[in-house]
Amino acid sequence: MSYTIYLVEDEDNLNELLTKYLENEGWNITSFTKGEDARKKMTPSPHLWILDIMLPDTDGYTLIKEIKAKDPDVPVIFISARDADIDRVLGLELGSNDYISKPFLPRELIIRVQKLLQLVYKEAPPVQKNEIAVSSYRVAEDAREVYDENGNIINLTSKEFDLLLLFIHHKGHPYSREDILLKVWGHDYFGTDRVVDDLVRRLRRKMPELKVETIYGFGYRMMSS
């Protein structure tokens, strides 16, 4: 399964090295070298945070408080150059799940991440807070991405995604071709409404599990899964 992991590490070389190792496992990695940049991405939550305690503009303890305030259940691994018992205890008190001291082998971190993800999520990662589950798919509305049941991204065009959102947010509602033209293409479109049929056809081909019903002589609607 494809997990999303946020890495906060201010040492550029180590950041790049760990990112490469983590991505080699098939995980989606977003890395930061500053705490302030990580703050901007706290919502929606990833499946896992990896936090360096010592950062140039803040510290991992401050960040984990903010992270846990937004999502108490998201797991966190601390990494630090300090190997002090007080750091480990404080990290646990603040909600971290694991702690690894520098220097360490990247493979050790990978093993810890694997075990923690298995422990927290069992088989598959949960639907993120900005994601919508529809049929066997997960739709990340903010990121404008769609994932199949194996966590693989389904590449949709902008209008395919707009049509998908229209159907998702109005399940069971019948839309005429003219309605869809207006909502997806806008008032400035001039042309045949048959482009709607082509758009629906492409969406069905890419997402065959969607329950999009044809209303003959009128338009379309998406039925509940």
UniProtKB/Swiss-Prot annotation:
Protein name from the UniProt record: Transcriptional regulatory protein CssR
Biological process (GO), any one: regulation of DNA-templated transcription
Function in brief: Member of the two-component regulatory system CssS/CssR required to control the cellular response to secretion stress.
Location of the Response regulatory domain: 4-117
GO CC annotations, alphabetized: cytosol; protein-DNA complex
Family matches, as Gene3D superfamilies: 3.40.50.2300, 6.10.250.690, Winged helix-like DNA-binding domain superfamily/Winged helix DNA-binding domain
Main location: cytoplasm
Molecular-function annotations in GO: phosphorelay response regulator activity; transcription cis-regulatory region binding
4-aspartylphosphate PTM sites in chain numbering: 52
Record keywords: Cytoplasm, DNA-binding, Phosphoprotein, Transcription, Transcription regulation, Two-component regulatory system
Xref: SUPFAM superfamilies: C-terminal effector domain of the bipartite response regulators, CheY-like
Presence of keyword Transcription regulation: yes
Modification after translation, per record: Phosphorylated by CssS.
InterPro entries in the record: CheY-like_superfamily (IPR011006), OmpR/PhoB-type_DNA-bd (IPR001867), Sig_transdc_resp-reg_C-effctor (IPR016032), Sig_transdc_resp-reg_receiver (IPR001789), WalR-like (IPR039420), WH-like_DNA-bd_sf (IPR036388)
Disulphide bonds in the chain: none
Compartments, as annotated in UniProt: Cytoplasm
Gene assigned in the entry: cssR
Record SMART domains: REC, Trans_reg_C
DNA-binding annotation, residue ranges on this chain: 129-224
